[in-house]
């Protein structure tokens, strides 16, 4: 407007008296071309008259005064004012015109004159991009700017006030006359109204209203005044906060503060205790609590309830028709806000229940074939449940309230499950029966699984030390999800004793295997304890066979892997994670962590190799399994033995020249033992042997030690034949 006026030839001087001084900070920034700016400050009247009439009579001037135009009698420039051009404007009018707000809202905008004085705030208001202006959208926009919200959305404003620095924001609202408007909008959007509204009270009302949508009658009587009428709108609002990762930490702190102030969860707990005292059924309350995730303390109530059922072995306890494991699964689902926080607690509860339930339903058959079939089909899961229980239990920061359940799990696993199934297995496990199980023997592994690939397709064999059957089952379930390959799983019966030296030797190609009284093993007269010795034995059958360490392959890049495997026929890769940790007393209680790592490492290596080299066939197996119990046996529970008869002693087996015919001990001889005997406890006990760990053991004749897994993995692409001019593509 000013530039348009100055463009007129007759306009030389424009007087602008800014009554409220709204543009005092900005007038010097105006782009006026050749026009000069002169500021009247109330004391420079005479100089101003001299400047405009004498000193510079040619230039065009904008004369600005940040005060109202004085009367003619008090205005030394009155004569000049009347032959010059006056300019009138106010910030509200200017802003509404620039932004595109209809002039009918000028009076509404004028209420917030202080807001429009700040150029930065005006720019932020413009950036909101409000589509349609009315009194409400204007108010929300102003409040959004003052609360650092970048969208004209009142729900976002309330989130900011509930979760942010609301003291600073309320001061900004007060300074600009918008506090009352904020509370009016809270009533309109959420139904919140109070004689003394404050953000803590609003937050409490919002959270408790959300909680009431599922807690229903379980909401304590004293808390019901907090429930807002617009429940559906509040539920959607709170759920959006809970589901947004950017707000979750702030929400958790807010809810914790509200619960501490109102004792909301404590009141619910008190109500449940009274029901117990009155022998009143609390199933409806538990159903309500199970459906609600507003407060972390509600998960504690559910966890305490589940632990109580497990401690009392009430395994048919339910909430809403769900058993304890299903309840734990549901509370761990992402639909529940605190699922990640309580993941370890619920996982511990889930597998405690599944282990206890499975053992309670198990029938301990005396028939070897039935035992083997049942173990392969379902009873192996008891070992997995036990492992998964401890894996989660060990990760709970404070697991003290789980101690009774842990003890019950331990007793059921060790004294009910292992001490029943292991004697059943051993009592009927004669040499004749061993041959009648229809399972391949470990010493026949090469002949049974690999002989057909000699000189033909490449085969990769991964042998993981102590990778027991139930661990392999978990790996197998992962491999089943991979569309690039087809897995099949079987098992073999391990050699005895079920230890590394014997198991590793039995997996090599051989015609004859011999084990002496010191547990030294040879295959076809050759030692086979080291990687180099095993590589030599493999190459004696085929120059293109090779033995490699797992770490060497896992840490290699694609070029190095091709260098290691290109042109090879049968590739043995030796992995040692479980036994390396379990066999050391200092780390034996980390064995279940080692199992999880072993599963992950083998899976990653298979995926890596299937991408890097042509190998249509993989086999994943182990040298032996293991037994693990968390609690140590008392000395009087250990099995005594005749020391004078022993050539070799171990926690789980003895090597003797003559069979040990004592109660609780089983003696067996194998062809490769040179008429020596392997003597093992009938149960899952250990011999009274000094030294070493006793939680993690192997060498004996339990299903867990002897059922050696064999995963056969077929890559779903056409394989290549070797030896006929191998190419980089073949590698």
Residue ranges, per PLM feature:
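Metal-dependent active-site segment of extracytoplasmic phospho-/sulfohydrolases and closely related
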Residues: 459-460, 606-634
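N-terminal, non-catalytic alpha-helical interaction modules of very large eukaryotic scaffold proteins
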Residues: 1-267, 274-280
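A long, amphipathic alpha-helix that forms part
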Residues: 412-415, 424, 583-618
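Short secondary-structure boundary/capping segments
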Residues: 31-32, 77-84, 475-482, 586-592, ...
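Segments forming glycine/polar-rich beta-alpha architectures that bind adenosine-containing cofactors
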Residues: 437-445, 449-493
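Conserved small/polar residues in nucleotide/adenosyl-binding loops
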Residues: 723-731
């Amino acid at each position: 407007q000013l530039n348009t006026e100055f463009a007129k030839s007759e306009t030389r001087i424009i007087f602008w008296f800014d009554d409220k001084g709204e543009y005092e900070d900005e007038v010097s920034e105006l782009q006026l071309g050749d026009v000069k700016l002169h500021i009247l400050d109330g004391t420079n009247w005479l100089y101003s008259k001299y400047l405009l009439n004498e000193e510079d009579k040619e230039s065009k001037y904008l004369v600005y005064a940040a005060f109202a135009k004085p009367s003619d009698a008090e205005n030394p420039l009155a004569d000049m004012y009347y032959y010059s051009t006056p300019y009138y404007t106010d910030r509200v009018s200017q802003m509404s015109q620039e932004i595109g707000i209809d002039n009918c809202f000028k009076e509404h905008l004028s209420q917030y004159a202080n807001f429009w004085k700040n150029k930065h705030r005006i720019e932020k208001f413009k950036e909101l991009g409000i589509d349609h202006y009315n009194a409400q959208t204007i108010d929300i926009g102003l409040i959004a700017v003052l609360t650092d919200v970048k969208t004209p959305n009142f729900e976002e404003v309330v989130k900011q006030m509930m979760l942010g620095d609301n003291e600073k924001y309320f001061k900004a609202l007060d300074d600009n006359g918008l506090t009352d408007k904020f509370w009016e909008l809270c009533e309109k959007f959420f139904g919140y109204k109070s004689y003394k509204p404050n953000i803590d009270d609003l937050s409490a009302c919002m959270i408790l209203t959300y909680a009431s949508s599922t807690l229903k009658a379980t909401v304590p009587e004293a808390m019901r005044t907090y429930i807002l009428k617009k429940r559906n709108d509040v539920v959607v609002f709170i759920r959006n906060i809970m589901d947004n990762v950017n707000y979750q930490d702030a929400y958790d702190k807010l809810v914790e503060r509200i619960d501490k102030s109102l004792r909301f969860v404590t009141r619910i707990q008190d109500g449940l205790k009274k029901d117990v005292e009155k022998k009143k059924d609390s199933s409806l309350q538990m159903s309500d609590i199970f459906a609600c995730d507003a407060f972390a303390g509600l998960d504690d109530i559910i966890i305490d309830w589940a632990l109580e059922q497990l401690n009392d072995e009430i395994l048919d306890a339910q909430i809403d028709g769900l058993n304890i494991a299903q309840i734990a699964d549901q509370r761990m689902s992402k639909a529940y806000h605190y699922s990640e926080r309580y993941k370890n607690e619920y996982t511990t509860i889930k597998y405690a229940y599944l282990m206890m339930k499975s053992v309670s339903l198990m029938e301990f058959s005396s028939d070897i074939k039935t035992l083997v079939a049942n173990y392969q089909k379902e009873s192996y899961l008891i070992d997995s449940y036990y492992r998964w229980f401890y894996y989660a239990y060990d990760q709970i920061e404070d697991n003290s309230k789980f101690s009774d359940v842990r003890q019950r799990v331990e007793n059921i696993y060790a004294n009910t499950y292992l001490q029943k199934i292991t004697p059943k297995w051993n009592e009927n496990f004669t040499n004749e029966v061993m041959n009648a199980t229809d399972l391949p023997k470990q010493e026949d592994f090469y002949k049974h699984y690999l002989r057909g690939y000699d000189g033909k397709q490449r085969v990769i064999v991964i042998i993981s030390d102590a990778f027991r059957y139930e661990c392999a089952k978990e790996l197998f379930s992962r491999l089943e999800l991979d569309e690039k390959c087809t897995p099949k799983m079987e098992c073999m019966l391990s050699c005895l004793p079920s230890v590394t030296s014997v198991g590793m030797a039995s997996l090599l190609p051989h015609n004859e295997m011999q084990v002496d009284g010191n547990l030294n093993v040879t295959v076809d007269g050759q030692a086979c304890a080291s990687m180099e010795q095993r590589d030599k034995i493999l190459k004696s059958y085929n120059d293109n066979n090779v033995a490699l360490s797992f770490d060497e392959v896992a840490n290699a890049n694609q070029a190095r892997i091709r260098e290691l495997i290109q042109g090879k026929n049968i590739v043995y890769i030796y992995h040692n994670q479980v036994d390396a940790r379990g066999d050391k007393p200092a780390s034996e209680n980390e064995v279940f962590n080692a199992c999880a790592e072993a599963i992950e490492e083998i899976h990653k290596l298979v995926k890596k190799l299937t991408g890097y080299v042509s190998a249509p066939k993989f086999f994943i197996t182990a040298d032996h399994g293991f037994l693990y119990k968390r609690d140590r046996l008392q000395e009087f529970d250990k099995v005594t033995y005749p020391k004078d008869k022993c050539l070799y002693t171990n926690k789980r087996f003895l090597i003797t020249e003559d069979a040990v015919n004592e109660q609780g001990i089983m003696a067996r001889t194998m062809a490769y033992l040179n008429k020596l005997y392997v003597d093992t406890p009938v149960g899952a006990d250990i011999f009274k042997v000094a030294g070493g760990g006793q939680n993690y053991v192997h060498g004996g004749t339990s299903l867990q030690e002897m059922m050696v897994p064999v995963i056969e993995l077929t890559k779903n692409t056409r394989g290549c034949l070797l030896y006929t001019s191998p190419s980089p593509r073949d590698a």
